[in-house]
């Protein structure tokens, strides 16, 4: 396939040794949740800083101050700094970017970001078990909460949303298509360069070969390929 050939040519070109990718995991997760992406990007020549932080311990503001400075320090001396986030990791980054500038800023891929807040927090946030599991940062993610206060994103941002759910109960709360945790509509944000919906779930999307391929494509080219599929990826890997 022509698409597979194009993707093969793309991946055959190593990233600049001076390109760095900062990764931020989601709520109640850890850096290991992004291990597949981390290892793939490293194989493609990127320097990767997979930041780990205790996502349920503090507010988004405090978490961002703890996670971003050391991650960015690890990228010092590189040509460009890119970002890949999952879920609430995007809100940490948006808060940080609202108050700081990143020298030599590259591209950003947000996976399942609650950019317009979460209807689940609206419905369940007042319940004690929810607060215990998700902490102060989780409580900030209501549809009238912090995400809505942060404004448009910067140039070079691509968003991937999922449309498959592993939680039918949550999906009855979420409006329209959703990934089991975040509605597709809530992932959209003013200023984004691209938005892609894929049949993947919130919890496991970062391990999907197609998602990994789309992340790599966007970091390299600033665009997604909606037609990229498992056949293309298989042909690429077995060529």
Regions found by a protein language model. Give the residues of each.
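Short hydrophobic/aromatic-rich motifs at helix boundaries and adjacent loops
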Residues: 39-43, 184-187
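N-terminal signal peptide c-region/cleavage motif recognized by signal peptidases
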Residues: 12-14
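Helical cap/lid subdomain of alpha/beta-hydrolase-fold lipid enzymes
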Residues: 98-239
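Serine-dependent carboxylesterase/thioesterase catalytic core
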Residues: 19-27, 31-32, 36, 42-154
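Sec-dependent signal peptide recognition
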Residues: 1-7
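Short hydrophobic "helix-edge" motifs at membrane interfaces and signal-peptide entry regions
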Residues: 4, 16, 76-77, 102-103, ...
